[in-house]
Amino acid sequence: MVPKLALIYTGGPNRELGQGWALGGVSKIERCAATKAVDGVPGSVQYKNSDKLCLDGQRLIQVDSAGVPLAFPQSGDAAAVASGSYREYRPERDSLTRVRAYGGSGSYGPAYFMVWSADGRLTEYGDSPGAATDAKARHLASGVGVSWAVSRAADSSGNFIQYLYSNYWGYSFTAAYEWTLDEVRYTGTAGQAPSNKLVLTGEGVRSCKCKVNRCSP
């Protein structure tokens, strides 16, 4: 397995990759708002157990042990999960992908997620058992889990990739940590650590002063 990263122009603010650029190919699960189409009533992210969850922008729907969606409106989507148990979901438009939440405490949300794809891949998000000890893949706002970035991905043959991040004080949420991808370790196999790695480095964010439709350093 090899990482598949890409530079994407979003037109957004000045960030680590420069004005308007973002890094693609980094999967994540994050809190998202309820919608009228799915939940009957639109909502907003409140950083509570009642928040909804999305995998790469696609809504996760709670299901029972047979994979049947629970009755709507669903509750506790973003709640922590008791030790030895899990909560199961399906992506809204992909019934063949199985998502489970594990761990966590109080109202802080799950500790990690495991995602099984139809092609045999197992992808882990957050502070999962297979994550590198310094992965920092669960991102918090005042202790509450805000997003869970991919920490490990493995194929059906046991080949795997690990992802490591930096957390820093940001501006997206009240008292929140933001994150950047620092390193990708790949060519790992069952019983053998990855022998190759991709390290992302930068010279800092270049700021600019904008006037009408032009910028100057």
What are these regions (language model features)?
Residues 1-217:
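Conserved catalytic cores of ATP-dependent inositol ring kinases
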